[in-house]
Amino acid sequence: MRGLPVFVILLLLIASEPSVDARPKTKADVPLTSLNDNAKRTLQILRNKRACCPYEPSCCI
């Protein structure tokens, strides 16, 4: 009788295990549009830093 509650708890834990779809995404799973957006954002940041005024640091922020 002692083992019954432990068995029930283990059974519930196994049943509530995350499914295959709940796995975190890998780099191979990321859509290509997301990578393109990241590249565009990085280029925009680099352009903004390049156009920065050397004599006025506040324009670089």
Curated annotation (Swiss-Prot):
Coiled coil: none annotated. It is found in: Secreted. This is Conotoxin Bt5.1. The keyword Signal applies. It holds the Pfam family Chi-conotoxin. Belongs to the conotoxin T superfamily. Expressed by the venom duct. InterPro entries: T-conotoxin. The cysteine framework is V (CC-CC). One of its GO terms (molecular function) is toxin activity. Its main location: secreted. Keywords: Cleavage on pair of basic residues, Disulfide bond, Secreted, Signal, Toxin. Residues 1-22 form the signal peptide. Contains 2 disulfide bonds that can be either 'C1-C3, C2-C4' or 'C1-C4, C2-C3', since these disulfide connectivities have been observed for conotoxins with cysteine framework V (for examples, see AC P0DQQ7 and AC P81755). Residues 23-48 form a propeptide. The keyword Disulfide bond applies. GO terms for cellular component: extracellular region.
